[in-house]
Amino acid sequence: MSFPISKVISAGLIFLVFFSCKTSPVQQEETVSAVPKDTVYYDTVIGPPEPPPAPIVYSVDTFLNDYASLVSGLPADKYFGHFYLDSSYMRLERRSGREWNYMMENKINNMRAWSDTVVAPSSEAKALFYPFAGADFLHVDPLFHNVNRYVMVGLEPLGTVIADTGNKRVLKSHADKIYRSLYFSNRLGFFRTLSMRAELNQKELNGALPLLLFYIRRFGYSISSLEYFDLDSTGNVLQSDPASAIGLKIKFHDFKGPIRELDYFRFDLSDDGLQRDDRLIRYVSKMEPYGVYLKAASYLMHNSSFSSIRGTILNKALFVLQDDSGIPLSSFEEGAWERQLWGKYTRTISLFRGRYQSSLASAYKQGPSLPLNFYIGYNISHKECNMMWFRKSISINTTQSNNQGANQS
């Protein structure tokens, strides 16, 4: 008996489908019967893959990078070989190395691990705003290494690269002054405003730049560029020379990740200062969604004379990470912010005893508060440090994003 060739082919296809599927007989029957006899199968057509992102071009300013190595006690033989092999510099190099290793083992590594579980997973911020920072990049990198842009503000001058780089005596004095100015700050966990102001107003150490370069280089980054700039009345950047600049920008990288930017401003953030000149606030308002870090801030935002910067932070920041010297607990509207406490809080140092917050002590007592495995801030002297993480509630964030979109449309 003969069969039409089409039926033979159909039967063969059904046979192959039947034995190639690892399903139950019922499923097999349903699968076969669900396919119309006239169904035609096509391979899914996939378009060409999207091209990979353009590779990052990592440039290095070899002189600036060598200078950063010199001030941080690292090999600097490209431009400073005449001093790098000098016995006095080699002693400084050993001291700086021992001090940095101590900081890494006793503080920085713990901070970085803490940040990986607390800060990095909890915020979409692309930038960090650090008022009252001075040159404190020591705490910025380990706590916010997931952020690529940093805006730091202090009262210390911007500073420049030392002019007389060919003079061994001047270089030694310059490097020694940097080491001494940072030694106590590194151990204490904060900059002493009055002493730092005096130390950074000298001929051989005239501002924050060398200290920032010290930290950037010690954290393993290479320096791409340094620019000085001014701001127009709307907060847009204008080119400037160091003498008249309002800020400086350092670009740096580690040859692996993104190119990072650090802006340092010398600016008065008091209400009087911002009333005279609000360009910095306008500049910050143009930033990507940002978080805020506050540490050893002299309790300035507890005063009515710093209400403007306090209000800006509370209105615009996605998160605030701070110790008790930042914004008072009572300023964070309940329900608008998620809160987590770390460490311990029962008192302030005697210099700021008038800034004790009974509401904060009650919050710590009621809990929950989690242990903090590193020392930071004013209370480091009696080993009672605290950190507070405030994250704007999702509903508040969504409302602000919608409002920003409406304003931009």
Model-based region annotation:
Residues 10-18:
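Bacterial N-terminal signal peptides
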Residues 150-199, 224-238, 242:
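Thiol-based oxidoreductase modules, predominantly thioredoxin-like and allied folds used
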Residues 27-182, 261-409:
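Non-globular targeting/processing and membrane-anchoring segments
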Residues 1-9:
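Bacterial N-terminal signal peptides that target proteins for export
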Residues 133-145, 151-155, 188-213:
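Short, thiol/selenol-centered motifs that function as redox-active sites or metal-ligating centers
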Residues 114-119, 212-219:
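Hydrophobic, Leu/Ile/Phe/Ala-enriched alpha-helical segments that form helix-helix packing faces
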Residues 217-282:
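Active-site/pore-lining binding-face segments in mid-to-C-terminal subdomains
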